[in-house]
A protein has these predicted regions:
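The conserved beta1-alpha1 loop
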Residues: 54-58, 125, 273
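Serine-hydrolase catalytic-loop signature spanning alpha/beta hydrolases and amidase-signature enzymes
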Residues: 58-68
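Active-site loop/oxyanion-hole signature of alpha/beta-hydrolase fold enzymes
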Residues: 39-47, 67, 74-123, 127, ...
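Alpha/beta-hydrolase active-site loop signature
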Residues: 60, 87-91, 159, 303-306
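Conserved serine/cysteine hydrolase catalytic core
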Residues: 46, 217-301
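Catalytic histidine-centered segment of alpha/beta-hydrolase-like enzymes
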Residues: 299-316
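Flexible "cap/lid" loop of the alpha/beta hydrolase fold
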Residues: 133-138, 144-192
């Protein structure tokens, strides 16, 4: 699950510089990369590098959100290594600016190169989907001759530019409000949920946001009040708050007048749309096909979180695509 733009119609440690991409084919800007935290499930034969599936979560998510799905995918594909990453400023990965898709794609590139991965299948949902597309498109734009990416899977997000939802701004605001409360006010997740409730009626969204909350250590073990300790979110709210424009953007622009794009990813691409979600629609589908000419679009009867709402159907789409393409 992730919180990104509109949900549906119902509606630090930095490392060496890494060459990345721009909107043209010229010299590309450089970004400090971070070493991403990850979890993995490896085949019994010890294969850790051949034909892995690398998963990128959405905004406010983490690798933990994909734990049960990864276990199920491992049962479906026991010979394929699985990696679920924490994107920068999420989970256990370092906090760093900028929070742009260029920077996120550079982090993913570093992970793939450092691990020596080959014939990578890259899967991304929402924010992670945009980062995955940005990485795929950067390969030709950068003129990389040795391309480790073989397949791309994008879940319910388009390669387009738009303003972030007011929901996103509101979530940041109330999360900052929770952090600003005096020590002792937030002792349990229920305490924090009561503050979130007036801003978000959907309990599943509130529970998802609160997976990022770190409670005072004494809250579960003792009633002793620690005047120094407060509830804190593990995501850097300051960085995210001033990254809203960047998170609504995309590094490459589609020209609707002549349907031209500055670069393409020509490999097999699976795009999964939730029919109850407006993220992928008739306005941005032409951009998808221009950037990813070897794209197949599949729909599931779900909202934005297609993998959580229809896990069995989602897994079948992914497994069939990886085995056949």
């Amino acid at each position: 699950m992730s919180v990104f733009l509109r949900r549906s119609r119902r509606c630090p440690r930095t490392f060496q510089h890494c060459r990345l991409f721009s909107r043209t084919h010229g010299e590309t800007p450089r970004h400090d990369t971070v070493e991403l935290s990850y979890s993995s499930i490896l085949p019994e034969n010890g294969n850790a590098t051949e034909k892995p599936l690398v998963i990128l979560h959405g905004l406010f998510g983490s690798k933990r959100n994909w734990g049960s799905i990864c276990k199920a995918l491992h049962r479906d594909m026991p010979d394929r290594p699985l990696y679920a990453l924490d994107m920068r400023n999420h989970g256990a990965s370092p906090h760093a600016s900028p929070m742009t898709y260029e920077a996120m794609a550079a982090d993913v590139r570093k992970f793939i190169m450092d691990k020596g991965l080959k014939d990578v299948a890259l899967l991304g949902h929402s924010m992670g989907g945009k980062a995955a597309m940005a990485y795929a498109l950067s390969l030709k734009a950068n003129g990389e001759t040795s391309i480790p990416l073989s397949q791309l899977i994008v879940l319910d997000i388009a390669p387009s530019i738009g303003s972030l939802s007011s929901d996103f701004i509101q979530y940041i605001h109330v999360m900052q409000k929770i952090e600003d409360l005096p020590p002792g006010v937030i002792k349990t997740r229920t305490d924090a949920d009561n503050i979130l409730k007036p801003y978000e009626s959907d309990i599943s969204i509130r529970q998802f946001l609160l997976t990022n909350l770190k409670l005072p250590s004494h809250s579960k073990t003792t009633q002793r009040h620690d005047a120094e300790e407060k509830a804190k979110f593990i995501v850097p709210l300051g960085i995210l708050s001033y990254s809203m424009e960047a998170l609504g953007s995309f590094p490459y622009r589609y020209n609707p007048d002549d349907q031209s794009v500055p670069t393409t990813w020509d490999g097999p691409t699976l795009v999964v749309k939730g029919t109850k979600s407006a993220y992928i629609n008739h306005k941005n589908t032409p951009a998808f096909r221009a950037f990813f000419p070897n794209m197949q679009l599949e729909e599931l009867d779900a909202g934005h979180w297609v993998h959580a709402e229809k896990p069995t159907e989602f897994r079948k789409l992914v497994v069939d695509f990886l085995n056949e393409s």
